[in-house]
Structure formats: structure tokens, C-alpha cells
Curated annotation (Swiss-Prot):
EC number: 2.7.7.7
Pfam families recorded: IMS, IMS_C, IMS_HHH
Protein species of origin: Bacteroides fragilis (strain YCH46)
Gene from which this protein is expressed: dinB
Record note on quaternary structure: Monomer.
Name the UniProt record assigns to this protein: DNA polymerase IV
Principal localisation: cytoplasm
Length: 364
């Protein structure tokens, strides 16, 4: 059986790079896309800012402490969407099997490609060059025989990187990979892995599938496969929306129940509007809480009936909130999302669970 040829393209510091491209006076300077006010959050950081430790999702106040000369510019989402479409026009000249993950990254299956190019790495080089010449932007590319390895490869030599992981190199490459670099392993899961003595791919490969499922649920099977260089997921040219959510960053931290309930009502109301606009139907509600110290938790519950209106969503959200201890830990952000559309409903209905799998993008 012939190996697949998968490319993962990741635009480097996309939002910040677009701003520096369009505003030459910002080039070479530490830049953050976002708002500088007290409750602001960094949406993206240029590489100049990253050298000071500034990262996306960091509070603007912390970012300014790390880099006092940091320049803040407001985001221009319509511009970023337009540039993303231009990038995808380049992709489509090589393949129509494109799976976007966000505005700035996508998988491409070039096993069969429109240009008849034999080597996937040559396609990746061509795409990178065209993005640079036509759009004045820089992208990193990872090339391998599955999605997991292609994504890992694209992160390996950023910015402006190009890395290929061949089948005969995969096991050794994965063995040395820090567990934090595995796709789907966020800070919470990484800490749990460390407590289990798992710090790299080699140690993960030594774990049985039964042990990983026992510790992490169904996603443990995915970790088991990843450690062996196995990822059978296809590049899905049409991605089915699997969740819709919304979240509010509060003007000030809150811990009084009445204030939390009022804010929960506002978030639930906005969520219902989005569900109705998109005609989305799901039966799992997830509550996301971010505390004043930026730690966060999620709580989820699945119902037999679809969650389509405020009368169903708000009582369930309040029930989820009872699982959160916030009186001593003021809340900074509240989010709600609905997932599990129609036939994808999990068999464990009505069962409380803590979500630890960190792929979710809250429908963004």
C-alpha cells in the first residue's frame, strides 16, 4: 500500500505578520494584536515580542510587564479572513483535499496532486515560495505520511520552517518528542502524563492501550497510536461543524453567585442566538470557566433531548456551575458550548465528566 503524502501548512505569527506587512513602520518591532487595557488579552504576538516571552492568550498587562515597549494594534478579522482566502487559492492549485484548522493553518493531501509533482516536499517548497512572493508572508510546512506527524513537523523549525518526517524516521523522531509536543496534549493532560512518569514519546509507547484508556478515556487510544506513528484520520475537505460556543471575558473578576448567574444568563442567551442562526442541534453542553489566575476548567453533561433553546440550556448550565468552586477563586471568563450533533451523541447520556481532551476550538 502506498503511503499518503500529507502537508501541514502553518502561517507564522499570522495576524501579527499581516499587520507588519501592511504597516512597514511596525516591522522589526515587538507587536501584539489585541487591546492594551487592563482586561485585554493578546490575540497574537510577533516573533520580536515572543523573544520577551509574550504569547497569545496572555493578559495584556502581563505582556506589557514582560515587554514594556510592546506595541498593541487592534485586530482586523475581515482582513485576516481575506488573506486566508488568498492562501487557500494557492493551495487549490495543487490539491482540493484541504482541511482548514483555522485561518492560519491547514492540512493538504497531495498524494494525488494537480501538478503531477512526485515529491510532497517539492509541493511544500513551492507553496511556501508562492506565499512569500505573492503575499509577502512566511509559512512553515511539515511533510509526512499522516496528519499527526505532518503537524508535528511544521512546528519543528519555525519560523519559515520545512521539515519532512519519513516513515523510516518516525519511530525514532517520536521517541524523542516531549509529551507536551503531542497533538492534543495541553497543560492539564501534560501534568497528568508527568505524574504517570510519561515525559516523552518513548515512555508513552511503553504504555498499554488499556492503561491509557483507563487514565484518559477514549482519547487514550489516539495517544497509543500516535506513539507508534499511526494516524489513520483522512484529510477532510469538508469539515462538519461539531460545536458552537461563545464566551465572555468579564470587565472585572466576579465570585458572588448572583453576579455569576447573571453573566451565565447573558452567555447562554448569546449561545442560543448562534445556535439558531446556524441551525445547529446538539445535546452536550460544556461550561468553561477561566479564573483570575488564568487557570481554567470545563464541565460537560449530555442530555437525551437536543439543546436548542434557553429553557433547556440555562438550567443545565446552572447545574454544571454547581460543580465549580469559585467563591475563593474569582472568575475572569465564562463560556458555554453545545456539541455532539444528532447521530454523534455519546452513549453515556446524563453522566458527569471532566473534559480533558484539549482539541476543542469552541466553534471558532
Amino acid at each position: 500500500m502506498n503511503e499518503r503524502k500529507i502537508i501541514h501548512i502553518d502561517m507564522d505569527a499570522f495576524y501579527a505578520s499581516v499587520e507588519q506587512r501592511d504597516h512597514p513602520e511596525l516591522r522589526g518591532k515587538p507587536l501584539a494584536v489585541g487591546h492594551a487595557e487592563e482586561r485585554g488579552v493578546v490575540a497574537a504576538a510577533s516573533y520580536e515580542a515572543r523573544r520577551y516571552g509574550v504569547r497569545s492568550a496572555m493578559s495584556s498587562q502581563k505582556a506589557k510587564r514582560l515587554c514594556p515597549q510592546l506595541i498593541f494594534v487592534p485586530g482586523r478579522m475581515e482582513v485576516y479572513k481575506s488573506v486566508s482566502r488568498q492562501v487557500h487559492e494557492i493551495f487549490h492549485e495543487y490539491t482540493d483535499l484541504i482541511e482548514p484548522l483555522s485561518l492560519d493553518e491547514a492540512f493538504l493531501d497531495v498524494t494525488e496532486n494537480k501538478q503531477g509533482i512526485l515529491l510532497a516536499v517539492d509541493i511544500a517548497k513551492a507553496i511556501k515560495q508562492r506565499i512569500r512572493e505573492e503575499l509577502s508572508l512566511v509559512a512553515s510546512a511539515g511533510v509526512s505520511y499522516n496528519k499527526f506527524l505532518a503537524k508535528i513537523a511544521s512546528d519543528f523549525r519555525k519560523p519559515d520552517g520545512l521539515c519532512t518526517i519519513h516513515p523510516d524516521q518516525a519511530i525514532d523522531f517520536i521517541a524523542r518528542l516531549p509529551i507536551e509536543s503531542f497533538w492534543g496534549v495541553g497543560p492539564v493532560t501534560a501534568r497528568k502524563m508527568h505524574l504517570l512518569g510519561i515525559h516523552n514519546g518513548l515512555q508513552l509507547r511503553e504504555c498499554s492501550s488499556e492503561m491509557l484508556v483507563r487514565q484518559f478515556g477514549k482519547v487514550g487510544l489516539l495517544y497509543y497510536d500516535f506513539a507508534r506513528g499511526v494516524d489513520l484520520r483522512p484529510v477532510e475537505a469538508v469539515r462538519i461543524r461539531k460545536s458552537i460556543g461563545c464566551e465572555h471575558t468579564l470587565e472585572k473578576d466576579i465570585h458572588v453567585r448572583s453576579s455569576v448567574i447573571i453573566e451565565l444568563y447573558h452567555v447562554a442567551t448569546e449561545l442560543v442566538e448562534r445556535l439558531q442562526q446556524k441551525e445547529f442541534r446538539g445535546n452536550t453542553l460544556t461550561l468553561k470557566i477561566k479564573f483570575h489566575d488564568f487557570s481554567q476548567i470545563t464541565r460537560s453533561m449530555t442530555q437525551a433531548q437536543e439543546l436548542t433553546n434557553l429553557e433547556r440550556i440555562l438550567p443545565l448550565a446552572k447545574q454544571l456551575l454547581k460543580e465549580v468552586e469559585y467563591e475563593q477563586h474569582p472568575i475572569r471568563l465564562i463560556g458555554l458550548s453545545v456539541s455532539n450533533p444528532r447521530e454523534e451523541a455519546d452513549e453515556h447520556r446524563g453522566v458527569w465528566e471532566q473534559l480533558s481532551f484539549e482539541f476543542s476550538d469552541w466553534g471558532k
